[in-house]
Amino acid sequence: MRGGTYVLNFYSAVFVDQLKRGRKTATIRLGDKSNKYERGQVVWITVGFRHSPRQKIFAAVIDEVEVKKVSELSRRDIEHDNPEFRRVEDEVNFLEQIYSRPVSADDVITVIRFSQIVEPPESHFGNGETPSHN
């Protein structure tokens, strides 16, 4: 397991609501990212621009890291990355905007699926009981 803190950052604030509501549970990244992310790894999910302050949305655990070609993307892959998209063409257009370069069906991508880590509510005393106010 890799040490240190890793981040999955999203550049658009549009994703904040989708992330918080659990509608966005994956990210599709251009290239093979399997050397950076692995199943079971804990990461911070953040939003912000490169070289700028970023907002931590939540901590997450990586459920799956799958390297494949763009042409092998499933509808499920696409919908988990962006609930508004249904077609590979939509995803390709999006990737081209993010990476500022053409993306072909033969390009390698990495689908990273993640689940939010929900923090337990703070106990009042440590024994789970609510303090009485007599």
Give residue spans per PLM region:
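Structured alpha/beta reader/binder surfaces that contact nucleic acids or chromatin modification marks
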Residues: M1-N134
